[in-house]
């Protein structure tokens, strides 16, 4: 499987990392590590996570209140968004 990250998701990830690093030293790195683990799980088990629409799935991070929204087409996983669950609950 090939992972692609949309520009929107990339900026959301960077914003979250920056925010967490301002809260506590290296917390942003911990966020990114949790995100990478979740992306690896998506890559290894792309159909594990539930559909929220016909073609979009959601994976919830383990340690942070964020969800990864992605689509699966053939051998490409496209990460559309990495959204905070409380700030954007109906994202």
Q: Language model features by range: what are they?
A:
Residues 2-56, 76:
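Basic, Lys/Arg-enriched alpha-helical interface segments
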Residues 7, 63, 81:
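Pocket-edge structural micro-motifs
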Residues 46, 65-66:
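Short, proline-centered helix/strand-breaking motifs
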Residues 54, 63-65:
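Short connector loops at helix/strand junctions that flank enzyme active sites
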Residues 58-60:
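A beta-hairpin/wing motif
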Residues 67, 71-91:
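Enriched for short, Lys/Arg-rich terminal
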């Amino acid at each position: 499987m090939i992972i692609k990250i949309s520009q929107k998701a990339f900026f959301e990830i960077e914003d979250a990392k920056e925010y967490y690093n301002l809260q506590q030293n290296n917390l942003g790195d911990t966020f990114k590590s949790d995100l990478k683990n979740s992306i690896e799980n998506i890559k290894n088990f792309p159909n594990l996570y539930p559909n929220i629409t016909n073609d979009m799935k959601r994976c919830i991070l383990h340690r942070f209140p964020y969800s990864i929204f992605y689509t699966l087409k053939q051998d490409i996983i496209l990460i559309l968004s990495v959204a905070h669950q409380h700030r954007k609950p109906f994202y």
